[in-house]
């Protein structure tokens, strides 16, 4: 994932948490904030309750892969994906479905792509 597609600074994370809207399902919470830019930016947070560093990094890699696969469908907003406990035990396909579901609930998918439930 290119650096231009990442939310990295603490100031940006805090702005999204403070001024953005949140949406959640059982496995993910998404905070999103509309910004005037030509592409999306994403931050990923996996807490220490999820497991050891190896497990957390594996979860982050899977989330990053799903986000980049859906990249052409995402609206130009900043958003933060927070993984909840239990996400570490999901297979890739289940993680993809859960993440797609919460993005759809947050209305972060462009019109026309929302009907594509399964890939």
UniProtKB/Swiss-Prot annotation:
Coiled coil: none annotated. The keyword RNA-binding applies. It catalyses: Endonucleolytic cleavage of RNA, removing 5'-extranucleotides from tRNA precursor. It comes from the Bacteria. It is an enzyme of class 3 (hydrolase). Its EC number is 3.1.26.5. The keyword Transferase does not apply. GO terms for molecular function: 3'-tRNA processing endoribonuclease activity; ribonuclease P activity; tRNA binding. RNaseP catalyzes the removal of the 5'-leader sequence from pre-tRNA to produce the mature 5'-terminus. It can also cleave other RNA substrates such as 4.5S RNA. The protein component plays an auxiliary but essential role in vivo by binding to the 5'-leader sequence and broadening the substrate specificity of the ribozyme. Consists of a catalytic RNA component (M1 or rnpB) and a protein subunit. This is Ribonuclease P protein component. It comes from Streptococcus pyogenes serotype M5 (strain Manfredo). The gene is rnpA.
């Amino acid at each position: 994932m290119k650096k231009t597609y990442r939310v990295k600074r603490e100031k940006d994370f805090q702005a999204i948490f403070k001024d953005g809207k949140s949406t959640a399902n059982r496995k993910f919470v998404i905070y999103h904030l509309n910004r005037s830019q030509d592409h999306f930016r994403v931050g990923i947070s996996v807490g220490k309750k999820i497991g050891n560093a190896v497990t957390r990094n594996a979860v982050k890699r899977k989330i990053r892969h799903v986000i980049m696969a859906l990249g052409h469908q995402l609206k130009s907003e900043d958003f933060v994906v927070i993984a909840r406990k239990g996400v570490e035990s999901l297979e890739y396909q289940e993680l993809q479905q859960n993440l797609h579901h919460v993005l759809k609930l947050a209305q972060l998918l462009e019109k026309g792509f929302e009907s594509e439930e399964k890939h």
